Amino acid sequence: MVKNQHYIPRFYLKNFAASDSMLSVIRIENGKPGSVFRCKPDGICSEKYLHEVKSRSEGAYFQEGAIEDMLSQVESRLAPKYEELLGCLDNGELIGTARLVELIDCLIAFIASLVVRHPKWLGPERKKASTLIPFLFEKETLTVSDLETLEVMGLKDDLPAIVEMAIMDAALFSTDERAPLMQIVDILKPMNVTFFAAPDNCEFIATSFPLHAEWMSTSDADPVAVYFPLSSQFAVAFRSCEPTGGKLVWPLIAEQVDSLNRCLVGGSDLNDLVFGTNGSYLASIISATAQHARKSID
């Protein structure tokens, strides 16, 4: 069983590393940024035994490593296609082809997965396990016969752990249309896709929740635009508007990249880490984001 379990896969993190394969990182605590530090992609966006559930009968954890193994299988399928997409953006191949559509579908699945596996989203869902048990009996999803079977197996005391594992399984892997994963996919899939390229000597940065969404009004359920940095060189926007025309990748100027980076950093309370290739640039973006927020309040 892996001790440090990532909520953002390493194959994504490494695309924001410098030429020496190291990330520059700033931690944000209580809204205040710390100092820049450097680390390998393995060293951030992870927690000890993040996807494990305490057991009363099977030792330390119930079915230890099960969720982490399933996530690793998902990542092993998505990672090559993610790298292929970045390669296509870099050299302009596959424009308008069925293969590109397939790669975008995989990208959407990956983005949806990042949302539901974030501990600040998944954690509260997992805590519902104990309170969910009476409801499951009421709906006869669980029965007295099930309890008797668990008792014979020596697992009766682990019913909360079993339900918590089921919650994670449904949230992270279910393709049922009612599942959180598929609800996010269904929002993104009809949207038009635009890719962006950063100019030389400029970079897209990422965060511990690398997603920025915008709504037309506070009463709307679904966003009208979603921004996601793909690497230090490329980013993507999903928008519920008319297509922008025949280009696959739109080159941006430095000011536009800065603006997108500020939107990402300031767009969510889930961002407790900001990372990229250049520590000084990260600090300047965080500072500019804070200044903009103060002006908005004033």
Question: What label would you give each PLM region?
Answer:
Residues 1-4, 8-298:
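Alpha-helical structural context detector biased toward long hydrophobic helices
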